[in-house]
Amino acid sequence: MKRVFICFPLGNDVENLIIQIKRYVLYALKCGMAPVVPHFYIWVFHHKEPDEWENAKQAGKSLLWVCDEIWVFGEQMTREMEQEICISKNLNLPIKYIGEDDVDYRLGKR
C-alpha cells in the first residue's frame, strides 16, 4: 500500500477532531492507501508545554519523508497545513485536495 499523509486543520474541539480523523482515515483506507496521521499523537501535547508542542509538530512533519502522497482535507488552511504542503512540494510528493463531498460519497453518506 502507498502511504498518504493526512493533512487537515487541528481544532480545539477534541470530539469533533476525533470524528474527522476517523472519517479521513476510513476514506484513505477505502481508497487503498495507508493513512499517516500525526494528529493522533500531536494532540496529546496541544498547547500544554510550548517545547513539547513544537517537538510534536516537527515530529509530525518528519513523517512526510516516508509518505508517497499528501491529501489535504478541510475548508480552512492553517499555517501548519501550509508548512506541510510546502515540505511536500519540496519532496515532489503528489498533493491532492479532497472536499467533504468526496469523503461523503466514498463513505456512502450521500
Regions found by a protein language model. Name each.
Residues M1-R110:
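Catalytic phosphate/metal-binding cores of nucleic-acid and nucleotide-processing enzymes, i.e., regions
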